[in-house]
């Protein structure tokens, strides 16, 4: 009897790319003929798996992981119909595929051998077809509820039929309890994995279905078998949204144009028109084909008004009226004489879908970033200047209860010293919605960082389990006092950073509704004074020995401790940050990378453009790059209290950058040494010819179901210039991530994730403004600079420079960013408003 070990089961998000409709509609009509011109082609084809077979279980392979054959004739269409494991040998994958030439279509099968042997620890898995007949009858009769039930440790008070498939999929690793109702003397059942039947959470949540990967033990002979059981009856909803309200992404294959080469050669405007047509069709279907007037009863515009708007919109690079209405954009409302009475907000955040361009050559469900890996020195440089920030507060309403807030923060600036000692007053940047947790109840903060020992192209472990990641905890040296104003000081935030209140642009009915609502950009700065901070704990891998660390660092003086925390930033002048002096809206050519290049230019084409680098510290709950059994020691710690370093790099680099001695790298340097670019996502894009550029007030004034409420209990509307970083959609905890270019120039700060589009919003530090020529009434994209100030639309003192000047007036303070003090704006950051 053939025996194989049971493979480890990958927890990486499942893969699915929808087969083009024309092929799918033909496969049911296929009949195998005695002789076909396609037979010879099929006999010469060699099919391959995308990744490393030796480390992959055949049963975990999805259809789109099979490579298109290189020697396929141009007039033949190849499509994978199904993949499944050989019953005889579970290290063999059988691929069922079709070939189509003209009106002729044929179906074939192909065996790909060499997948990882199937094992679970030291247990042997046998071919189920070789089991005795009595046992096979039992296996064929296994049914959930009838034969067995299960409960998840993560949801002890809920049955599985009260949980969405996505909830089960994301949380089963915390533990599964099996209750077996039948065949207790004959059979032992274990659930070792859950899979989405169609590869994505949307269809699973819509249908309430999952595939259970079962390990079955015959108690009579202790033989172990493997079975995949598709089960229904889980909680469902008509739209397939997950437990967080995330609407599943639109399958990117449905958005692809038929001729990609033709698309690549077109202008950005022509590409937008192609993409937008397909995107709107799907958006309309998701809204049950309702007219935009039904979806936006707040809008009022005649055919003539819309025609006039669309003509003007094209001249200033904006979306058409109807298209913008479906997307939930802010739009003008017209009076009977055609004049604009004001703008109307949609009052909700409209779902956003992914871009097929962002997913080219990739698994569309995994393009949200690269975990626990530094592909190159640029990312490492950013990592040395970036921290996971933990803020611990007393709960003012409950005794002995604490609230912890986590985000990402990074070095912005430091006060220079006159005695050449290492600086101890440092300025860190993060999001307003993170810094809002700093208040009079703040007891302590943690700064967690990757230490200098960390190397590129290696895979790190979870934050609390890695020897290279240290967590430093601080409280005020003034015992009995909380941290605010005793070692920790708030310097600046983006509340009401613009002169004009949002309500002033709105129609009368909304003026009243939003009269007390402010404007904001999600940015804040705080100061840490290491002279006033006491180090209370230090730890790295909490499974190891940490006692010596506290003793070691407690002997450091404030200068020495600041030097360790900041990785000697003050002495590394060449690595210190700068700011982008001209936004990508103002000069899009710097970031307008081609979608196709000549092969001879492969090593140089990208050097003409800016690249973007984003690195943050999200919690580990959405890090699906672990493997059961291989990573068991980490899986049980994959919680909100553990963090995964995350970048906007290529997910395909994961575990594939280590080069064996004498071997060739899996990816050429021209790929691994780069950063990334801006997303082509359509749902946010307000500047239609500039992918990745967004006016927040027009496209996303509200993020989620409600306006942002700050610590002052006031509500705020999102305003200003935003960017959409490509391939960056990490979990909570990454808020505050900096987006910078290859020159270490700060571009934006990341603050909102849109999982369904695998991108998010990053607030720009600088906007030169943009004149819409009356398209939106008296509203234009505002001019401002959050660091240097001086924008004509900016509230006085609402910049980091002016805030520092106000706080430290007459103190003759100088910093790295402002070596001559805070009175003057550097020439390159002055606005030309002549």
Swiss-Prot record:
Membrane topology: Lipid-anchor
Lipid attachment locations (S-diacylglycerol cysteine): 26
Subcellular location: Cell membrane
Gene Ontology terms: cellular component: plasma membrane
Positions of the Lipoprotein-associated type-17 domain: 143-237
Swiss-Prot/TrEMBL keywords: Cell membrane, Lipoprotein, Membrane, Palmitate, Signal
Disulfide bonds: none
Superkingdom per UniProt: Bacteria
Signal peptide boundaries: 1-25
Entry protein name: Membrane-associated lipoprotein
Gene source species: Ureaplasma parvum serovar 3 (strain ATCC 700970)
Species lineage: Bacteria, Bacillati, Mycoplasmatota, Mycoplasmoidales, Mycoplasmoidaceae
């Amino acid at each position: 009897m053939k025996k194989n070990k049971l493979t480890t089961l990958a927890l990486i998000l499942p893969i699915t790319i929808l087969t083009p409709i024309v092929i799918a509609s033909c496969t049911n009509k296929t009949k195998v003929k005695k002789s076909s011109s396609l037979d010879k082609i099929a006999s010469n084809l060699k099919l391959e798996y995308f990744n490393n077979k030796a480390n992959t279980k055949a049963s975990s392979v999805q259809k789109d992981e099979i490579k298109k054959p290189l020697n396929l004739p141009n007039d033949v269409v190849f499509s994978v119909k199904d993949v499944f494991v050989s019953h005889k040998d579970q290290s063999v994958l059988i691929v069922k595929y079709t070939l189509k030439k003209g009106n002729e279509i044929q179906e074939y099968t192909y065996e790909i051998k060499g997948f990882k042997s199937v094992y679970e620890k030291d247990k042997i898995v046998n071919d189920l077809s070789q089991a005795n007949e009595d046992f096979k009858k039992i296996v064929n009769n296994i049914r959930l509820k009838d034969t067995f039930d299960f409960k998840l440790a993560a949801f002890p008070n809920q049955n599985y039929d009260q949980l969405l498939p996505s909830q089960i999929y994301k949380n089963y690793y915390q533990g599964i309890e099996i209750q077996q109702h039948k065949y207790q003397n004959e059979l032992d059942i274990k659930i070792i994995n859950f899979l989405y039947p169609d590869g994505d959470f949307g269809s699973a949540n819509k249908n309430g279905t999952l595939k259970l990967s079962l390990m079955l033990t015959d108690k009579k002979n202790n033989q172990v078998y493997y079975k995949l059981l598709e089960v229904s009856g889980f909680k469902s909803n008509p739209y397939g949204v997950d437990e967080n309200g995330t609407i599943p992404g639109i399958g990117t294959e449905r958005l692809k144009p038929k001729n990609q080469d033709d698309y690549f050669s077109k202008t950005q405007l022509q590409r937008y028109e192609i993409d937008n047509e397909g995107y709107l069709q799907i958006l309309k279907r998701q809204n049950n084909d309702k007219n935009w007037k039904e979806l936006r009863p707040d809008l009022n515009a005649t055919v003539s008004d819309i025609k006039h708007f669309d003509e003007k919109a094209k001249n200033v690079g904006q979306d058409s009226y109807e298209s913008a209405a479906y997307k939930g954009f802010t739009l003008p409302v017209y009076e009977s004489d055609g004049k604009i009475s004001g703008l109307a907000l949609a009052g909700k955040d409209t779902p956003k879908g992914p871009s097929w361009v962002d997913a080219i050559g990739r698994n569309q469900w995994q393009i949200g970033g690269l975990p626990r890996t530094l592909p190159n020195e640029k990312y490492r440089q950013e990592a040395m200047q970036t921290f996971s920030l933990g803020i611990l507060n007393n709960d003012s309403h409950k005794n002995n209860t604490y609230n912890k807030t986590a985000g990402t923060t990074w070095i912005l600036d430091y006060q220079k010293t006159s005695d050449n000692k290492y600086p101890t007053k440092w300025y860190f940047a993060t999001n307003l919605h993170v810094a809002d947790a700093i208040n009079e109840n703040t007891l302590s903060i943690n700064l967690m960082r990757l230490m200098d020992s960390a190397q590129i192209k290696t895979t790190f472990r979870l934050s609390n389990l890695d020897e290279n990641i240290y967590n430093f905890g601080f409280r005020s040296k003034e015992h009995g006092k909380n941290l605010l104003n005793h070692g920790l000081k708030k310097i600046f935030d983006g509340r009401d950073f613009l002169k004009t209140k949002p309500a002033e642009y709105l129609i009368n009915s909304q003026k009243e509704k939003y009269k007390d609502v402010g404007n904001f950009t999600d940015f804040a700065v705080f100061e840490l004074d290491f002279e006033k901070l006491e180090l209370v704990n230090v730890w790295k891998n909490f499974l190891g020995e940490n006692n010596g660390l506290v003793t070691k660092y407690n002997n450091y003086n404030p200068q020495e401790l600041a030097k360790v925390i900041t990785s000697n930033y003050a002495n590394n002048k060449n690595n210190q940050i700068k700011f982008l002096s001209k936004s990508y809206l103002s000069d899009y050519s710097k970031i307008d990378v081609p979608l196709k290049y000549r092969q001879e230019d492969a090593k140089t084409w990208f050097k003409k453009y800016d690249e973007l680098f984003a690195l943050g510290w999200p919690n580990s709950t959405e890090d699906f790059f672990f493997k059961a059994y291989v990573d068991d020691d980490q899986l049980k710690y994959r919680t909100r209290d553990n963090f995964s370093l995350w970048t906007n790099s290529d997910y395909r680099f994961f575990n594939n950058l280590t080069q064996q001695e004498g071997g060739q790298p899996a990816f050429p340097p021209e790929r691994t040494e780069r950063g990334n670019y801006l997303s082509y996502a359509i749902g946010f894009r307000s500047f239609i010819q500039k992918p990745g550029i967004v006016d927040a007030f027009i496209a996303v004034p509200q993020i989620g179901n409600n306006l942002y409420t700050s610590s002052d209990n006031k509500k705020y509307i999102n305003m200003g210039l935003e960017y959409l970083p490509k391939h960056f959609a990490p979990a909570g905890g990454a808020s505050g991530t900096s987006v910078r270019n290859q020159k270490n120039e700060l571009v934006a700060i990341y603050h909102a994730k849109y999982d369904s589009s695998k991108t998010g919003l990053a607030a720009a530090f600088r906007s030169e403004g943009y004149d819409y020529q009356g398209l939106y009434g008296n509203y234009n994209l505002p001019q401002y600079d959050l660091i240097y100030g001086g924008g004509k639309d900016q509230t006085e003192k609402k910049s980091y420079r002016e805030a520092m000047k106000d706080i430290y007036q007459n103190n003759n303070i100088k910093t790295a960013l402002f070596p001559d003090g805070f009175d003057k704006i550097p020439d390159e950051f002055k606005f030309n408003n002549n």
